[in-house]
């Protein structure tokens, strides 16, 4: 791990606890871009840039002002790590901020005229939804990039690559379009069909191959996003891609709606009504189509995308193993799911704010006068000229919603008269009526409410005349139109009236005429709140302004959105004459604040600043007033580089506050230093009262810090000359100017600071000295200067890194050599025990590696905290030159660690296929096995790395048909892939190789892997009720009994119950026998001690009384001591405690004979008959073990009738059979479950002859009865005493052995024998031994009643290994101790038996047998 990854806490460590004896770590190297993300610029900027753009939008030159303000905000919130600065990551990204802000301002520039938009509400709805989705996408973008980089499954990778290509094109082309000016923007959106971006995006929802919709549904339909286990990272990555792709799909939807809405309004404002209608239709169609695809409409869509994705996420959340999942990607999905749910609900309820139906073009045009009192208007007047064609169209409007526009009416040719009467159909909605002369731009002529259906087409002509540039002509026409009935209060585009039109043109005489008709028009606002005084002030119509003020216009009136007064507008435009005129009005608020808190003085700080001088010198304007973000006019003067305005402010007699801070703690001097405005800095520092050491809020930056940080070195030098400058001042993280100068690589600033008395080794909060930081910067002069100045060459950061670490990591060969020459410690370790050699290797710097190894060859074996040594790291990074060099110095690619693992093993566990390939290509022996006798291929299978598995097979690095543990490597590989729930590997074997050995369905059922069970049943078509060939057992019974925990209660898990439920659903008859030994699901649950499964089976129709070879379930449970099963059967399922088997024995007989005292007591408590007689009139006490017999006797004679002397069928105790050897009999094993599952039940005679409770451990099936234990012990006795055990006593009570019992005991003994030989034999020759043959011979000996022949047979196999030295005997003893849980100190060996297995089996024996003690 590179020092930078460690230091920045950005390394990705995945520790795999499944690897025994070795912590396994997989990592991803960070790029510089990754490291730099610690600036958190994206997250900070997303929330602030929009705010900044909005805050300063009222300011002239807002784009210039916004960037440094945003940067100042970033300084207050962003990272301040000196190391990041040295890596050139913390230089505030001015260009990026400026670019993003310019995009914001471009969007403002492209905005259509407010109030003239028919689809304004649609645009706002789409923009709001689009922005919220984009914010979600930004938050998840890094995760998606990680998915692309790490996905392993070839099929999934191909799909996700296709999704990424669509997303990238969407992002890139969208940015390309957004950067264009309005007209070019529109042209790009309306390109011909072949290259039209919007049409391309619309195809995203089609089912054609390669579309975003089809790719997302490939993930869904192939169930690639559903993990099979907690380690199924590929599925989680696919789920993340599905989620991110769905977000993009929604984003595309609202982007399209927004763009078509924009185009519609663009054409609406430009009078191109046909194009408005066309884009209106596109917008509506896109919304409906995408909404249907996303959430369905009236449930007619069976698989709506969002619903399906949310359903998959819910299914994954309900996976029982999901609680064990450790995935940042999954956590991000879950965190964002709430947002997707909210979005689904919003889209479900969402309707476009439009009117669906289109008006009819029913227009009646009448030029005849209705009243003789209203004079006719003859042509020509305005556009009414003879021969001109005029036509009309209609649009509905209601509550801000608009319809399409009707077709044009039949055109009428103008002749002698103008201004006809228009009659249209009545409607409950308002109707907008448009008029078009010839091919000129259409214009709105009237808005009719629901009660109107007739009007005279004259009012728009008054509006048009009012804004004519010729005042006298305009006045004459307006008077004529008003006399003919034109309404002075009629509204048109943007809600403007004729008074607004006259203000635009400055026609005060027309305004006087209008106000004479309706004085209420004086302060009338348009839709945006602009009054005639606003318009006149902004248009510099001074006479009109004076006229309005004389008439009593409100001088402090504000616009609706930005709350601008007329004075704001005049000051912003630098219209000094208007400012002076407005200031003459009594009551004017010269310090009125607009929405962002800016006063007119703030807005007047422009390049010319004439209005600013007026406001400062001739008005009571406050010069220290702050905006909402804390900016004073002096701040704005600096931000706009307006020194003249600054001087006016400073020199005024109003006492400007030089050190006033904005909300981020930035003074004007901070901004001047950050921007590199040297003239400003010199001017400010020459003024009395300036605080050159002022610190920002939170981060404590001074102007000197900022000048150095932003690399404004001329400003920094100027500040360093100021008399009272503090050169050692500390910002956040204890960063001094010296640290920044070293980090930014300016040796001259470093020299100046040191020559001024700064301490060379002062440390940041993270322990960095200037030397550390200088080495990290590309400049090489600075570290040399610092070393010459006596900097500590062994100084350590808080994580223990020295300058040598950084020089090694960055490949600074000359600096590294200089440090070594000066005596730097080449063995210095940081907190993860990383030395410079590790840094050099992991970053591929061969020259430095050579320097270190030649200096000290012992560094070849230097290990860090994760036991990684140079050769390991060279292999991991695949640096061939470093790898070859280390090999030439003695590194061995096949060297084994304490667990017998080579590098090839370790990287197979990690799943790093490229490293595995690299190692094999460079001499790694792929045939080597570790101490668990596993090859790199075995480990790849076990840990689920299908890429390595495929590589090994396809490149012939493994012989699948090679004999291994009695089968083949392929057989065990398939078994293991199922056992460890590695779905990708399973798919590779089954689908790619078409191999299905090992009864995979039974194996999956045994290990309770539900998804694999479903895969084999549903996708591979395996019969879920068929018996397997090896053991003749159904999947259901195997699932019930279970592996790897076998017959212990802890294996009765919810996951296993899920599998049982699934298989029961596939099983026609739940009471049918499920193996060849007549076992039923119920009897299997009893034997397996699976209480919850037993209860489920009975609840679902299983017969709790169905006998197996004559034994009812309660009898079996009592016989083997399953207390919880007995209790459940009696209490929950009301089974008779005195039920009998076919020999008439009761459960109490069975429990007492095996001495299960807890069951005995419980049965008696529940009413069991202690005098019940079975075969040969035997009572429970006749068969009872010691404890049970004592308990039964203690109950008193009141319970017993005609008690006869007890007949004991007990086996002789071990110490009676073997006086010299006494040991415990618990034995363990580890093997494929299907190879040793015992599917039979105990025979009715077994309980008479043995105490056969089934023992088990958490991780493996551990079941063997006393007879089986004696067989194994006989072999051990022969090993140590050359005596044979006497089975007479034990065999005498055995009437028969069932096939399944004999098979189970033979399998277990075979496994024990394999373990014993593994403990003795270190080489691979044991792999050639056919243990299936061993099992077959043991099974025949047991089934034929010849257990004494087993030891001889085992000896015959052991003869192949004739040399057993004392050390091997000791190992054998230790292995036996492990397998049997018997302490070696408990084994008593009589010294007179001086010969052992070695003589009995014909082997060489050691000289001192007593070493086995």
UniProtKB/Swiss-Prot annotation:
Tell me, in one coarse class, where this protein mainly resides: secreted
Any one GO biological process: exocytosis
Q: In which tissues is it expressed?
A: Expressed by the venom gland.
Report the domain of life of the source organism: Eukaryota
What SUPFAM superfamilies does UniProt report for this protein, alphabetically?
Ankyrin repeat (SSF48403)
- Repeat: present as a keyword of the record? yes
This protein's record includes keyword Secreted: yes
This entry carries the following GO cellular component terms, namely: extracellular region; host cell presynaptic membrane; membrane; other organism cell membrane
**Propeptide residues according to the Swiss-Prot or TrEMBL record:** 1-28, 1193-1413
Annotated region Helix H8 is the probable transmembrane region of the tetrameric pore inserted in the target cell membrane: the residues are 238-257
State what protein this is by name. Answer: Alpha-latrocrustotoxin-Lt1a
Source organism? Latrodectus tredecimguttatus (Mediterranean black widow spider)
């Amino acid at each position: 791990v590179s020092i930078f990854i460690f230091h920045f806490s950005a390394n990705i460590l995945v520790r795999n606890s499944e690897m025994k004896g070795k912590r396994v770590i997989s990592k991803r190297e960070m790029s510089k871009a990754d490291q730099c993300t610690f600036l958190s610029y994206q997250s900070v900027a997303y929330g602030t840039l929009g705010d900044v753009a909005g805050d300063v939008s009222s300011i002239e030159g807002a784009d210039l002002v916004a960037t440094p303000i945003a940067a100042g905000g970033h300084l207050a919130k962003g990272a301040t790590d000196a190391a990041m600065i040295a890596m050139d990551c913390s230089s505030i990204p001015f260009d990026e901020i400026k670019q993003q802000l310019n995009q914001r301002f471009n969007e403002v520039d492209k905005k259509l005229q407010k109030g003239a938009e028919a689809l304004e509400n649609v645009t706002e709805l789409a923009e709001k939804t689009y922005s919220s989705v984009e914010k979600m996408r930004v938050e998840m973008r890094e995760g998606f990039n990680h998915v692309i980089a790490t996905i392993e499954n070839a099929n999934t990778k191909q799909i996700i690559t296709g999704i990424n290509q669509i997303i990238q094109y969407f992002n890139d082309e969208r940015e390309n379009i957004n950067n264009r000016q309005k007209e070019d923007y529109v042209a790009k959106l309306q390109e011909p069909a072949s290259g039209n971006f919007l049409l391309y995006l619309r195809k995203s929802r089609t089912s054609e191959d390669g579309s975003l919709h089809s790719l997302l549904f490939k993930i869904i339909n192939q169930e690639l996003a559903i993990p099979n286990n907690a380690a199924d990272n590929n599925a989680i990555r696919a789920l993340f891609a599905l989620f991110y792709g769905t977000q993009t799909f929604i984003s595309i939807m609202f982007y399209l709606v927004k763009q078509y809405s924009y185009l519609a309004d663009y054409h609406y404002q430009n009078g191109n009504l046909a194009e408005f209608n066309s884009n209106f239709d596109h917008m509506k169609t896109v919304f409906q189509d995408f909404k249907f695809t996303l959430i369905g409409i009236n449930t007619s869509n069976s698989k709506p995308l969002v619903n399906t994705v949310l359903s998959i996420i819910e299914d994954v959340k309900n996976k029982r193993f999901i609680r064990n999942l450790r995935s940042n990607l999954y956590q991000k999905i879950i965190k964002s799911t709430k947002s997707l749910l909210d979005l689904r609900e919003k889209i479900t309820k969402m309707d476009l704010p439009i009117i669906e139906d289109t008006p009819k073009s029913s227009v009646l045009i009448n030029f005849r006068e209705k009243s003789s009192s209203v004079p006719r208007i003859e042509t020509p007047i305005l556009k009414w000229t003879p021969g001109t064609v005029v036509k009309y169209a209609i649009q509905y409007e209601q509550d801000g919603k608009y319809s399409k526009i009707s077709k044009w009416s039949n055109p009428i040719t103008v002749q002698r008269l103008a201004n006809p009467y228009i009659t249209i159909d009545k409607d409950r909605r308002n109707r907008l009526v448009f008029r078009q002369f010839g091919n000129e731009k259409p214009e709105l002529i009237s808005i009719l409410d629901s009660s109107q259906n007739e009007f005279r087409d004259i009012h728009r002509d008054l509006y048009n005349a009012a804004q004519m540039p010729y005042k006298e002509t305009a006045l004459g026409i307006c008077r004529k139109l008003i006399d003919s009935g034109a309404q002075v209060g009629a509204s048109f585009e943007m809600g403007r009236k004729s008074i607004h039109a006259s203000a635009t043109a400055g026609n005060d005489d027309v305004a006087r005429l209008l106000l004479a008709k309706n004085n209420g028009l004086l302060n009338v606002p348009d839709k945006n709140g602009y009054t005639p005084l606003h318009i006149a002030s902004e248009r510099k119509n001074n006479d009109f302004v004076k006229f309005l003020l004389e008439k009593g216009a409100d001088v402090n009136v504000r616009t609706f959105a930005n709350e601008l007064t007329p004075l704001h507008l005049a000051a912003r435009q630098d219209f000094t004459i208007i400012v002076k005129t407005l200031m003459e009005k009594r009551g004017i608020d010269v310090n009125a604040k607009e929405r962002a808190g800016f006063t007119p003085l703030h807005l007047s700080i422009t390049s010319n600043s004439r209005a600013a001088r007026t406001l400062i010198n001739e008005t009571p304007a406050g010069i220290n007033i702050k905006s909402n973000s804390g900016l004073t006019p002096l701040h704005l003067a600096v931000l706009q580089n307006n020194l003249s305005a600054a001087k006016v402010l400073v020199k005024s007699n109003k006492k400007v506050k030089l050190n006033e801070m904005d909300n981020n703690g930035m003074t004007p001097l901070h901004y001047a230093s950050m921007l590199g405005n040297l003239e400003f800095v010199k001017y400010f520092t020459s003024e009395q009262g300036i605080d050159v050491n002022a610190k920002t809020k939170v981060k404590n930056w001074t102007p000197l810090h900022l000048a150095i940080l932003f690399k404004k070195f001329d400003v920094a030098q100027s500040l360093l000359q100021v008399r009272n400058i503090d050169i050692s001042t500390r910002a956040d993280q204890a960063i001094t100017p010296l640290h920044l100068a070293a980090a930014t690589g300016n040796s001259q600033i470093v020299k100046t600071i040191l020559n001024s008395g700064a301490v060379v080794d002062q440390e940041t909060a993270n322990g960095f000295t200037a030397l550390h930081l200088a080495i990290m910067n590309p400049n090489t002069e600075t570290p040399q200067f610092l070393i010459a100045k006596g900097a500590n060459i062994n100084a350590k950061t808080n994580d223990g890194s020295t300058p040598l670490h950084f020089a090694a990591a960055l490949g600074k060969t000359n600096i590294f050599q200089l440090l070594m020459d000066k005596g730097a410690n080449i063995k210095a370790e940081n907190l993860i025990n990383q030395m410079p050699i590790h840094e050099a290797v992991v970053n591929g710097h061969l020259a430095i590696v050579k320097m270190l190894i030649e200096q000290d060859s012992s560094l070849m074996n230097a290990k860090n905290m994760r036991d990684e040594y140079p050769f390991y790291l060279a292999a991991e990074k695949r640096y061939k030159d470093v790898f070859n060099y280390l090999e030439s110095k003695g590194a061995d690619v096949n060297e084994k660690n304490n667990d017998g693992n080579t590098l090839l093993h370790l990287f197979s566990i990690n799943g790093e296929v490229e490293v595995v390939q690299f190692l094999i290509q460079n001499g790694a022996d792929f045939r080597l096995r570790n101490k668990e006798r596993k090859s790199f291929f075995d480990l790849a299978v076990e840990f689920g790395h299908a890429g390595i598995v495929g590589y090994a097979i396809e490149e012939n690095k493994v012989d699948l048909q090679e004999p291994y543990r009695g089968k083949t490597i392929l057989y065990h590989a398939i078994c293991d892939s199922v056992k460890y729930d590695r779905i990708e590997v399973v798919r590779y074997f089954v689908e790619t190789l078409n191999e299905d050995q090992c009864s995979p369905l039974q194996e999956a059922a045994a290990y309770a892997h539900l998804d694999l069970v479903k895969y084999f049943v549903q996708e591979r078509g395996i019969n879920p009720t068929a018996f397997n060939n090896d053991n003749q057992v159904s999947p259901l019974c195997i699932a019930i009994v279970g592996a790897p925990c076998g017959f212990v209660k802890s294996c009765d898990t919810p996951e296993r119950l899920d599998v049982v439920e699934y298989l029961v659903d596939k099983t026609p008859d739940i009471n049918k026998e499920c193996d060849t030994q007549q076992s039923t699901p119920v009897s299997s649950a009893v034997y397996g001690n699976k209480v919850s499964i037993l209860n489920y089976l009975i609840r679902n129709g299983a017969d709790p009384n169905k006998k197996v070879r004559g034994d009812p379930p309660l009898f079996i449970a009592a016989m083997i001591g399953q207390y919880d099963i007995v209790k459940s059967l009696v209490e929950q399922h009301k089974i008779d405690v005195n039920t009998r088997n076919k020999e008439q024995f009761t459960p109490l007989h069975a429990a007492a004979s095996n001495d299960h005292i807890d069951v005995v007591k419980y049965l008696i408590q529940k009413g069991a008959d202690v005098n019940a007689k079975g075969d040969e009139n035997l009572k429970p006490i006749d068969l009872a073990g010691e404890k049970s017999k004592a308990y039964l006797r203690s109950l008193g004679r009141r319970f017993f009738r005609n008690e006869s002397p007890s007949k004991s069928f007990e086996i002789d105790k071990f110490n009676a059979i073997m006086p010299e050897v006494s040991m415990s009999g618990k034995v363990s094993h580890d093997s494929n479950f299907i190879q040793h599952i015992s599917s039979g039940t105990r025979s009715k005679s077994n309980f008479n002859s043995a105490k056969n409770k089934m023992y088990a451990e958490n991780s493996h099936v551990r079941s063997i009865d006393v007879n089986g234990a004696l067989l194994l012990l006989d072999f051990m006795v022969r090993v140590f005493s050359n005596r044979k055990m006497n089975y007479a006593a034990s065999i005498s009570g055995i009437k028969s052995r069932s096939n399944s019992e004999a098979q189970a005991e033979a399998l277990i003994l075979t496994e024990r024998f394999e373990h014993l030989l593994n403990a003795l034999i270190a080489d691979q020759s044991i792999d050639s031994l056919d243990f299936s043959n061993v099992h077959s011979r043991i099974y025949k000996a047991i089934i034929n009643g010849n257990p004494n022949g087993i030891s001889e047979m085992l000896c015959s196999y052991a003869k192949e290994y004739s040399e057993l030295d004392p050390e091997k005997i000791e190992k054998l003893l230790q292995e036996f101790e492990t397998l049997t849980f018997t302490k070696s100190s408990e084994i008593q060996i009589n010294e007179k038996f001086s010969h052992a297995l070695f003589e009995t089996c014909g082997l060489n024996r050691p000289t001192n047998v007593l070493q086995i003690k």
